[in-house]
Amino acid sequence: MARRGGFPGGMPGNMNNLMKQAQKMQRQMEEAQKQLEDAEVTAKAGGGAVEVTVSGKKEITKVKLSEEVVDPDDIEMLEDLIMAATNEALRQIDEQSQASMSKITGGLGGGLF
């Protein structure tokens, strides 16, 4: 009796469909990653006194400071505001990335993405 479809060793023919779905998911993930790389988010701290823009590649592309926060006697506050805005922008990029990957994987991956 001849076997139809499947792989040697008795794997079912549905394995072909599974492989096709995996390849499709991989293409979608690559496409989503490209879109994320092109994304930018801007986060503000200190009521908008400090703005930091981060790319999807997690590179800081812009830092904007309001004159009122540039106080030579309080550099520590400025440093804190820059750090807060940067961390928030990075958090937003991570959130976008996770949401995008979740759409593709349907929640699969156990936190790998």
Swiss-Prot record:
One GO MF term attached to the UniProt entry: DNA binding
Keywords, ordered alphabetically: Cytoplasm, DNA-binding
InterPro entries assigned: YbaB-like_sf, YbaB/EbfC
Subcellular location: Cytoplasm, Nucleoid
GO CC annotation terms, alphabetical: bacterial nucleoid; cytosol
Region described as Disordered: 1-45
Compositionally biased region (Basic and acidic residues): 27-37
Biased composition (Gly residues): 1-12
Domain of life, source organism: Bacteria
Gene3D superfamilies according to UniProt: Nucleoid-associated protein YbaB-like domain (3.30.1310.10)
Quaternary state and interactors: Homodimer.
Family: Belongs to the YbaB/EbfC family.
NCBIfam families referenced in this protein's UniProt entry, alphabetically: DNA_YbaB_EbfC
PANTHER family to which the protein is assigned, alphabetical: NUCLEOID-ASSOCIATED PROTEIN YBAB
Protein task: Binds to DNA and alters its conformation. May be involved in regulation of gene expression, nucleoid organization and DNA protection.
Protein name: Nucleoid-associated protein EUBREC_0329
Source species: Agathobacter rectalis (strain ATCC 33656 / DSM 3377 / JCM 17463 / KCTC 5835 / VPI 0990) (Eubacterium rectale)
Classification lineage: Bacteria, Bacillati, Bacillota, Clostridia, Lachnospirales
